[in-house]
């Protein structure tokens, strides 16, 4: 089972992608297991990541939520796609944040460890800030 984790940067069509996935969930279900923010399936992990990235939460809370998700999809014979744009923390300007994903490396490592020994691909969409 390969796990794909989508962490889109703001204004990169993350919500659009999540809506398309939701609207086509039945058709995709034979090919892909989808854990989608738009269905609130990532809420607890999202909140743990936001708290950790802002310094108000602990890494252990993020690990616990990742472990719950990993258990949920354990044994899946299909690839897994987990999508939520807040896994790497608030965007610049949100909650007074002035840094761009300062703990992304740490959260990425926790993601890889949670789904081990299966491969994890982290998809981080970015955009040209000058536009």
PLM segments and residue spans:
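PAPS-dependent sulfotransferase catalytic domain
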Residues: 87-131
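PAPS-dependent sulfotransferase catalytic core
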Residues: 1-93, 97
